[in-house]
Structure formats: structure tokens, C-alpha cells
A protein has these predicted regions:
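Charged, often glycine-rich, active-site loop that binds/positions anionic groups
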Residues: 11-18, 181-194
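Conserved dinucleotide-binding and phosphotransfer motif residues
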Residues: 164
């Protein structure tokens, strides 16, 4: 499916085929970077689709197109074969139309992969849940900035969990306000390192007979991906 090149973008405008149209309103963007995966899932072209999520590349287009988008916990799904963007936060996840379908997909794609040393053999084994559950509701995620419908749905489900006998407590994560700043320190540094091999300057294939730096980048990539 169409996506922003190297997962860099939030609209699929930085792609080989131009921006993907939103599944509900073609005048709007589908989101990104995995916008194409969200759209084909929303339009029932496929029962599910995969994507990568570093800083919202599954969750944002899923939200824009009204489907379920899951970024699994780091180490749950192998990243083998994925062109790394920022290795500390890159995760493979899925798009589906229901939460139940997302569970089925995650059961298939999760697990140990000897080609990815960050994966665990059975992610769910050490986290067997005892009933009743104790669930934290993050206060910083329930501010006035949250869409009222999303906030209402979350609080409604929290009450449903309480009625089922589970404990739901408000939990404060004061450092949450700093996460975006930390993201923009860590991710650009890792992107610079991971993608250095593709510019044809220091590592990898280097095109010849070039006149400008932009031409060096373009020809090196063209020759390397043929």
C-alpha cells in the first residue's frame, strides 16, 4: 500500500504515488506514514494490513480513516526485513476493522524471531492476567484537549470495567508532557545513522558521473533499488 518514503511523513505526500485519499472524504488526506494500509482496510479491500509505527504512523492514519490501528509493545513483533527509521521506537503493527480482528493478527505476527534479537519467545506468557484486573487511567491523557467523543467513550468503558469488578484508578505521568521533545532528540539522531547508507556519500552504492549532490543522492538510490 502507498506510504511515505522511509516512513517519513504524516500524509503519504512523500510517496512514489502522491497523497493517498481519505477513505471517507477524498478531499482530505489519509494520514501517514502508513496511510495506504489504513485506507485499503477501511474500504474492505483487505481484511487487515500491516504498517510500521515510530511516532504515530499506524495510529494516526487509523484515526483518520475510522479503523483499528495497533502499535504493539516493543519486542512483541519482529522487525526483520524492515528498513529502519529509528530503531528505538520502530514497531510493526496492524490495521483492522475490529478489535477482535486485531487480536487475531497480533497472535500470528508476534513471537520470537532469531533474526531480531529484540523479540521475545512468548510475549504473553509472563503477563498472564489474574482476575480482577487493576487498570490505570492516565490523567494527562484525559484533558480538555482530547476529543469529547473519545473522552466520553473511554470514561464509559472505564465504568463498564468497574461494574465488571475490576479496579480502575487514575494514574499521573507528569513526564508525559516532555515526550514530544524527547522524541525529536532521539529519532532524528537514529534516522541520520540508519539512513546514511542510502545517500551514496559514506556507505553503500555510490553513483558515478554526477554533477550535483542532489543528483548523487537520486542516482545512488535509483541504482541501489533496481
Amino acid at each position: 500500500a502507498n506510504l511515505d518514503a522511509f516512513a517519513h511523513g504524516g500524509s503519504t505526500e512523500n510517496s512514489a504515488f502522491g497523497p493517498t485519499k481519505n477513505s471517507a472524504d477524498p478531499s482530505r488526506v489519509a494520514g501517514g506514514s502508513s496511510g495506504g494500509s489504513a485506507v485499503v482496510t477501511a474500504l474492505d479491500i483487505v481484511p487487515f494490513a500491516l504498517g510500521s509505527d515510530t511516532g504515530g504512523s499506524i495510529r494516526q492514519p487509523a484515526s483518520f480513516n475510522g479503523v483499528v490501528g495497533v502499535k504493539p509493545t516493543y519486542g512483541m513483533v519482529s522487525r526483520y526485513g524492515v528498513v529502519a527509521m529509528a530503531s528505538s521506537t520502530d514497531v510493526i503493527g496492524c490495521f483492522t476493522t475490529t478489535a477482535e480482528d486485531a487480536e487475531l493478527v497480533l497472535e500470528v505476527i508476534s513471537g520470537r524471531d532469531t533474526r531480531d534479537m529484540t523479540t521475545l519467545p512468548d510475549y504473553f506468557a509472563p503477563t498472564a492476567l489474574e482476575q480482577p484486573l487493576k487498570i490505570g487511567l492516565i490523567t494527562e491523557c484525559m484533558t480538555d484537549d482530547v476529543d469529547p467523543e473519545v473522552k466520553q467513550a473511554t470514561l464509559k468503558y472505564a465504568e463498564k470495567l468497574r461494574a465488571a469488578g475490576h479496579t480502575v484508578e487514575e494514574v499521573s505521568l507528569p513526564m508525559l508532557k516532555h515526550t514530544l521533545a524527547m522524541y525529536y532528540i532521539i529519532v532524528p539522531a537514529e534516522v541520520t545513522s540508519n539512513l546514511a547508507r542510502y545517500d551514496g556519500v559514506r556507505y553503500g552504492r555510490r553513483a558515478s558521473d554526477i554533477a550535483t549532490l542532489a543528483e548523487l543522492y537520486g542516482k545512488s538510490r535509483d541504482e541501489g533499488f533496481v
